[in-house]
C-alpha cells in the first residue's frame, strides 16, 4: 500500500473496475427486497453545477447504503433533453439543438462518472429520442380516445415581430426578450389534458404521502385549491344572456353592490361597440401579461359597461364593470363584488365611487367601521332581511338553499387548478401526434404512423420553428386522405412526468411499460430533487402515475413513497462597480479576501486590484458569477473529498454554504483515514479478536466502535441526517488515532474498527473505501460487503471512566469496571503511566473518591 493518499490515481482505477464489472447493473429479483432510489434527471445544459453534485451525492449515499443492507437497489440516470435553452444555444453557436444536446450529454456523463455515482448506466435514457417519446405520443392518443384530451383556444403571449409565441419568462417588462417588441395577448388553439378530472384524487391522496415534506403537500393543496361555494345567475337588463358568478361567501350576498367581468368577456365586448373608453381599456388589457402572482399587487382598473344586473334576492339594479383583475381563463370570467367584506372589491369601489354596503357585524356585535378597509372576518349577518342574526355557516346554507329553490343558484365545488395546456409553439420538443383532415376533422395520428419523428437536421433562424417553417413536414395522409400534422410540440414537463417508470424497462418494445418490471420496482422508494418543482413537475408526476394506473400499466396509486428536497448551494458573491456604474461580478475563486478574527470577510479585491463589494452568501448562479465548477474541485481534491464535504457541511434539506476551507478539512480527514490504515497494515497480519480477553480500555474502545455503528446506521437509515453520521465517524477516528497498537489484541481490535469505519464511510467516499477495504483484506469487493452491525453486548456499559487528580490537578483518566471498589480504582490509577510519575517517591496523605467519577490523591 502506498503511503500517500493520491485520489487522482485510485479514483479512475476504481471507476474503471465498476464499469468493467457492471457493478451497479440490476435486474428484477423476487427473492430480494427492492429499493428504487431516484434523483431528478438533469437537463443537459453542458456542465454539471454544484446543485447537481449535491442532489446526486445524496442519492448515491442512500443507494449505496441500501445496497449494503442487502437490497436489490435500482439507481438510474438519464437526460431531460428537450427544451428552450437548446434552441437559444443552437442559434448562438450556429448549430442545431440535437448535436448541441448530444454533445452536452456526452460531456456531462463523463462528469457524473468522475464523481463516482453508482448508476445503472444500462438504463440511461434521453427524452429527446424517438425510442422514448414514441410511447408518450401513443399514450396521448389513448388519452384523447378516452376523452381526457381536448383542444380549445387560449390566450398566449405573442410577439408580432417574430410572429411567435413566448413563454411567460420570455416576456420582460411587457416586451419580447429577443427583439424588444411590445408583446400582445393572442388567442390560439391549444391542446389540454384534463388534470381537473383527477383534482379530488390528487388532493385526497396527499394524505397517503406520509414521507413527503409538509411544505410540498401544502403547496400542492393550495395549487389544487378546492373550494365549496355557490354558482349564482344574474339577469342583465338589455342583454341577451345571463351572467354567472361563483362565490365561496354566499353569506355576504346581500352586500353585493356591483359585478365585474373580464375585459375579454362577451358582455364587455358588446358594450365596447358604443363605448370608445371601454374599447381602449379592453385593448390595454389584451396587451398586458398578467401572471397570477402579479394580480394581487397590480393597480386595479376598470370601466363601467353601462349594463345593469338585477340582484336575484333584493331586486336592486347593480352596475356591471369591466375590470383588469378578472381573467377569462378563471371560472366564468365574471365575479360578484362585496366591497364591505372583500379588500380588493373595497379598493375598487372606493376608487370609482361605488356603493359599499356592510352586511356582517364586527366581532363585538357592532356595525363595522368601513371608513379605512373592508371587514373580511366571518360573523353574524345584519342588513340582510330575512337572514339577519344568522352566523356564517347558517347564512351560507340558508342563502344557498334559497337561491337553489329559486332556480338561480347551485352549490358547487370549484378548483383553482386548471387543465394542463401541453402545446408549445417551439421546435425542440416531441411533436403532438394529432392530424387535421381536409374537411377539418381532427384525429389522433394512426398507430402505424407513430412515432411522429422530430427532424434533427435543421437550420435555426431563432424565430420560427423549423417544422412550422417547412410546409412539407406537416403533409401526411390518413387512409389515403391528405392531412396536416400538428406542428406544436409537447410541453417538456410531459417527458419528465413518466421517465421514472420507463427506467424500469428502458428497452421494452411492446409498449410504454412492461407491467411486470414496473410493478416490481415501483413506487420509487425515495425521490430527490429541489423544492422549486413542488407544484409543476411533482403534480404532473403524480397525475401521470394515476393515468398509467388507470391504463393498467402500474398497480400503485402514487409514484414515490418518500420525497427529499435538498437545499440550495450558496457561495460568496463579489462585484466591483464599472466605469458606467454597472456591476461586474467576480468569481469567489478570483477574490483575494481579508477576514477578521471571527473569519468574516472584511475586505476583498481581485487580481487586477479592483476593490470588491462583498454581498454575502447567495445561491450559486451565472448572473452573480459565483458558481464553483465541480470539475475543478474534483481535479484539485478528488471526488471523495467533494462528496464528503457536500454531505458533511449541512443537513441535506438545508442550504449549504460552499467554503473551500471546509473542502480542505474534508480532504485532511480522508488523509488521516488513509494514514491510519497504512500504519496498521504496515505491521503485518492480525490475530483474531478475542472479545473475552479484552482489557477495560480495549472494551471501552470497542464500545465506542459499536456505539458509532449504531448511531451512523440510525442517522443514515432512519433520520437521514448524513452530516451527523459523518461527525460520529470523525469522532471515532480521533479515538482510534490515539489508541495503542502494540499488543496483539490492540491490533485485532483496530482491524475490527477500521473495517467498520471503511464500510460506514463507503456510501460517502466509495473510491478510497474500495481501496482501503482491499488493503485491510476485507472479503470480496466492498460494493458487495454487508453494512456493519452493532454488537449489543459490546455496547453495554460494564466499565466507567474515572478522572484521576493529584493534589486537585487532573493527571489522567482510567477505565475501571462499574462495580470496582475504591481499592481497585487506586490500584489501577497507580498503573496509569501519566499518573504514576506524580506518585513516585511521595506519600499519599488523603484519598477523595467519588464513585465511578473522580479519584483525587492528596500527596505531600
UniProtKB/Swiss-Prot annotation:
What's its top-level EC category? ligase
Where does it sit, as one GO cellular component term? cytosol
Q: Where is this motif: 'KMSKS' region?
A: 619-623
State the InterPro entries in the record: aa-tRNA-synth_I_CS (IPR001412), aa-tRNA-synth_Ia (IPR002300), Leu-tRNA-ligase (IPR002302), Leu_tRNA-synth_edit (IPR025709), M/V/L/I-tRNA-synth_anticd-bd (IPR013155), Methionyl/Leucyl_tRNA_Synth (IPR015413), Rossmann-like_a/b/a_fold (IPR014729), tRNAsynth_Ia_anticodon-bd (IPR009080)
Alphabetically ordered keywords of this record: Aminoacyl-tRNA synthetase, ATP-binding, Cytoplasm, Ligase, Nucleotide-binding, Protein biosynthesis
One annotated GO molecular function is: ATP binding
Q: What is this protein called?
A: Leucine--tRNA ligase
> Which organism encodes this protein?
Escherichia coli O139:H28 (strain E24377A / ETEC)
Amino acid at each position: 500500500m502506498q503511503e500517500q493518499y493520491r485520489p487522482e490515481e485510485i479514483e479512475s482505477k476504481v471507476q474503471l473496475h465498476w464499469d468493467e464489472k457492471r457493478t451497479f447493473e440490476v435486474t428484477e429479483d423476487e427473492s430480494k427486497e427492492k429499493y428504487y432510489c431516484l434523483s431528478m434527471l438533469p437537463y443537459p445544459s453542458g456542465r454539471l453545477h454544484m446543485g447537481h453534485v449535491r442532489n446526486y451525492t445524496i442519492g448515491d449515499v442512500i443507494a449505496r447504503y441500501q445496497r449494503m443492507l442487502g437490497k436489490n437497489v435500482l439507481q438510474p440516470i438519464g437526460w431531460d433533453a428537450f427544451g428552450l435553452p437548446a434552441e437559444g444555444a443552437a442559434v448562438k453557436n450556429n448549430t442545431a439543438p440535437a448535436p448541441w444536446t448530444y454533445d452536452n450529454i456526452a460531456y456531462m456523463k463523463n462528469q457524473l462518472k468522475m464523481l463516482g455515482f453508482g448508476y445503472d448506466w444500462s438504463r440511461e435514457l434521453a427524452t429527446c429520442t424517438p425510442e422514448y417519446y414514441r410511447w408518450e405520443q401513443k399514450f396521448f392518443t389513448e388519452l384523447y380516445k378516452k376523452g381526457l384530451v381536448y383542444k380549445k383556444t387560449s390566450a398566449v403571449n405573442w410577439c408580432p415581430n417574430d410572429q411567435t409565441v413566448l413563454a411567460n419568462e420570455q416576456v420582460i417588462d411587457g416586451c419580447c426578450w429577443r427583439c424588444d417588441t411590445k408583446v400582445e395577448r393572442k388567442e390560439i388553439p391549444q391542446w389540454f389534458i384534463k388534470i381537473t378530472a383527477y383534482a379530488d384524487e390528487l388532493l385526497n391522496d396527499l394524505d397517503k404521502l406520509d414521507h413527503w415534506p409538509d411544505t410540498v403537500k401544502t403547496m400542492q393543496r393550495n395549487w389544487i385549491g378546492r373550494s365549496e361555494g355557490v354558482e349564482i345567475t344574474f339577469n342583465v337588463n338589455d342583454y341577451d344572456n345571463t351572467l354567472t358568478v361563483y362565490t365561496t361567501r354566499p353569506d355576504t350576498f346581500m352586500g353585493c353592490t356591483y359585478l365585474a367581468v373580464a375585459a375579454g368577456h362577451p358582455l364587455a365586448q358588446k358594450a365596447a361597440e358604443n363605448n370608445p373608453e371601454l374599447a381602449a381599456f379592453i385593448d390595454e388589457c389584451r396587451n398586458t401579461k398578467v401572471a397570477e402572482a402579479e394580480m394581487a399587487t397590480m393597480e386595479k382598473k376598470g370601466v363601467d359597461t353601462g349594463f345593469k344586473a338585477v340582484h336575484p334576492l333584493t331586486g336592486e339594479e347593480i352596475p356591471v364593470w369591466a375590470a383588469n383583475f378578472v381573467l377569462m381563463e378563471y371560472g366564468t370570467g365574471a365575479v360578484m363584488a362585496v366591497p364591505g367584506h372583500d379588500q380588493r372589491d373595497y379598493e375598487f369601489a372606493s376608487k370609482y365611487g361605488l356603493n359599499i354596503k356592510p352586511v356582517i357585524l364586527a366581532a363585538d356585535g357592532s356595525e363595522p367601521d368601513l371608513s379605512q378597509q373592508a371587514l373580511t372576518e366571518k360573523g353574524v349577518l345584519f342588513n340582510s332581511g330575512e337572514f339577519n342574526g344568522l352566523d356564517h355557516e347558517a347564512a351560507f346554507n340558508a342563502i344557498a338553499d334559497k337561491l337553489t329553490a329559486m332556480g338561480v343558484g347551485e352549490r358547487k365545488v370549484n378548483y383553482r387548478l386548471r387543465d394542463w395546456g401541453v402545446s408549445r409553439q417551439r421546435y425542440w420538443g416531441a411533436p403532438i401526434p394529432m392530424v387535421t383532415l381536409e374537411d377539418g376533422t381532427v384525429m389522433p395520428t394512426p398507430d402505424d404512423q407513430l412515432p411522429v419523428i422530430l427532424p434533427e437536421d435543421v437550420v435555426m433562424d431563432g424565430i420560427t420553428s423549423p417544422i412550422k417553417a417547412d410546409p412539407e413536414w406537416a403533409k401526411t395522409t390518413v387512409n389515403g386522405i391528405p392531412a396536416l400534422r400538428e406542428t406544436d410540440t409537447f410541453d417538456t414537463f410531459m417527458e419528465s412526468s413518466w421517465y421514472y417508470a420507463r427506467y424500469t424497462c428502458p428497452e421494452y418494445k411492446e409498449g410504454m411499460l412492461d407491467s411486470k418490471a414496473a410493478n416490481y420496482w415501483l413506487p420509487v422508494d425515495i425521490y430527490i430533487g429541489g423544492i422549486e418543482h413542488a407544484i409543476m413537475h411533482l403534480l404532473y408526476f403524480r397525475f401521470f402515475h394515476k393515468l398509467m394506473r388507470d391504463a393498467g400499466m402500474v398497480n400503485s396509486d402514487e409514484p414515490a413513497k418518500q420525497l427529499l428536497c435538498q437545499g440550495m448551494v450558496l457561495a460568496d458573491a463579489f462585484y466591483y462597480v464599472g466605469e458606467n456604474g454597472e456591476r461586474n461580478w467576480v468569481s469567489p475563486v478570483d477574490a483575494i479576501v481579508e477576514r477578521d478574527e471571527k473569519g468574516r470577510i472584511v475586505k476583498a479585491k481581485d487580481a487586477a486590484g479592483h476593490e470588491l463589494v462583498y454581498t454575502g452568501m447567495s445561491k450559486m448562479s451565472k448572473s452573480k458569477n459565483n458558481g464553483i465548477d465541480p470539475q475543478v474541485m474534483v481535479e484539485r481534491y478528488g471526488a471523495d473529498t467533494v462528496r464528503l464535504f457536500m454531505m458533511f457541511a449541512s443537513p441535506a434539506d438545508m442550504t449549504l454554504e460552499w467554503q473551500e476551507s471546509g473542502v480542505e478539512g474534508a480532504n485532511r480527514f480522508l488523509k488521516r483515514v488513509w494514514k491510519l490504515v497504512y500504519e496498521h497494515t504496515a505491521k503485518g497480519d492480525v490475530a483474531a479478536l478475542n472479545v473475552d480477553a479484552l482489557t477495560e480500555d480495549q472494551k471501552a474502545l470497542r464500545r465506542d466502535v459499536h456505539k458509532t455503528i449504531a448511531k451512523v446506521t440510525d442517522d443514515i437509515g432512519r433520520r437521514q441526517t448524513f452530516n451527523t453520521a459523518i461527525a460520529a465517524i470523525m469522532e471515532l477516528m480521533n479515538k482510534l488515532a490515539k489508541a495503542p497498537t502494540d499488543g496483539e489484541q490492540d491490533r485485532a481490535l483496530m482491524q475490527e474498527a477500521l473495517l467498520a469505519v471503511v464500510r460506514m464511510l463507503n456510501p460517502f467516499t466509495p473510491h478510497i473505501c474500495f481501496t482501503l477495504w482491499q488493503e485491510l483484506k476485507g472479503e470480496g469487493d466492498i460494493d458487495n460487503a454487508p453494512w456493519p452491525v452493532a454488537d449489543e453486548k459490546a455496547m453495554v456499559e460494564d466499565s466507567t471512566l474515572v478522572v484521576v487528580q493529584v493534589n486537585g490537578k487532573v493527571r489522567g483518566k482510567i477505565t475501571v469496571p462499574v462495580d470496582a471498589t475504591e481499592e481497585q480504582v487506586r490500584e489501577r490509577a497507580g498503573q496509569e503511566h501519566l499518573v504514576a510519575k506524580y506518585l513516585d517517591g511521595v506519600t499519599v496523605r488523603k484519598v477523595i473518591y467519588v464513585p465511578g467519577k473522580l479519584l483525587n490523591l492528596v500527596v505531600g
